[in-house]
Amino acid sequence: MKSTLFSVAKETLQGVFHAHNWGQEFSEDLLETLIEEARINLNRKARLCLHPNPNEPLQVTYLAFSSPYSDRIHKHPHRPEVLVPIFGQAKHTTFDNAAVAVSSKIIDGRLPIAISTPKGVWHAIEVITPSFVMIEIGTGPFLKDSTVFLQNS
């Protein structure tokens, strides 16, 4: 499976692939390949970034998750984030500063309606189905402080 990803992307971290260039064509089994990669990764997640590197001003990423998976509560202090579910289901929850849930919504690939999270809002996803794939859209560059995790969450 990785050989398919390596033909179109470079693995920059375990389970994180960046396309060789914008406009790259991907095979029809892309989602299956990413889901399989998520199953074998210790963090239960795999990413294919359509942007060739983290410095790009536009960041578009396919993210695949394998159950059981739950994000740590986090926020993006410098940018909003848009998620589009394309396969499976997950629960998207926003939180206050005390890690108390403020809102929660099921996002479903059968109804691929985008959900946006404003910059600075604590949030997380929890995968409900055996696998879940979404597209994440944000602005770059992606820096060390682009994602901040809530302490004790």
Predicted regions and their residues:
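Glycine- and acidic-residue-biased ligand/ion/polar-headgroup-sensing regions
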Residues: 67, 77-97
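Extended, positively charged loop/linker patches that create polyanion-binding surfaces
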Residues: 78, 95-113
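Conserved metal-binding segment of the jelly-roll/cupin
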Residues: 66-68, 107-130, 137
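Conserved double-stranded beta-helix
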Residues: 55-70
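A short, N-terminal "cap"/entry segment at the start of jelly-roll beta-barrel domains
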Residues: 1-57, 103-108
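Double-stranded beta-helix
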Residues: 98-101, 105, 124-153
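His/acidic/aromatic-lined binding-pocket segments of jelly-roll/cupin-type domains
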Residues: 62-63, 74-75, 80-85, 114-115, ...
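Short strand-connecting beta-turns/loops that link adjacent beta-strands
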Residues: 55-56, 78, 130
